[in-house]
Amino acid sequence: MSNVGTTGRIPLWLIATVAGILVLTVVGIFFYGSYSGLGSSL
């Protein structure tokens, strides 16, 4: 049960934070596109 090969020493909370920001960014772009009319057909 060693941590060898698990992305170095990056803490789990940091990975979760970055992943959350990326998800919010993608969702924000999607809704912005829908609001702008690019995806209004949805």
Swiss-Prot record:
Keywords: Chloroplast, Membrane, Photosynthesis, Photosystem II, Plastid, Reaction center, Thylakoid, Transmembrane, Transmembrane helix. One of its GO terms (biological process) is photosynthesis. Signal peptide: none annotated. It is a single-pass membrane protein. It comes from the Eukaryota. The chain crosses the membrane at residues 10-30. InterPro entries: PSII_PsbJ, PSII_PsbJ_sf. GO terms for cellular component: chloroplast thylakoid membrane; photosystem II reaction center. Disulfide bonds: none annotated. Pfam families: PsbJ (PF01788). It is found in: Plastid, Chloroplast thylakoid membrane. Belongs to the PsbJ family. PSII is composed of 1 copy each of membrane proteins PsbA, PsbB, PsbC, PsbD, PsbE, PsbF, PsbH, PsbI, PsbJ, PsbK, PsbL, PsbM, PsbT, PsbX, PsbY, PsbZ, Psb30/Ycf12, at least 3 peripheral proteins of the oxygen-evolving complex and a large number of cofactors. It forms dimeric complexes. One of the components of the core complex of photosystem II (PSII). PSII is a light-driven water:plastoquinone oxidoreductase that uses light energy to abstract electrons from H(2)O, generating O(2) and a proton gradient subsequently used for ATP formation. It consists of a core antenna complex that captures photons, and an electron transfer chain that converts photonic excitation into a charge separation. This is Photosystem II reaction center protein J. It comes from Chara vulgaris (Common stonewort).
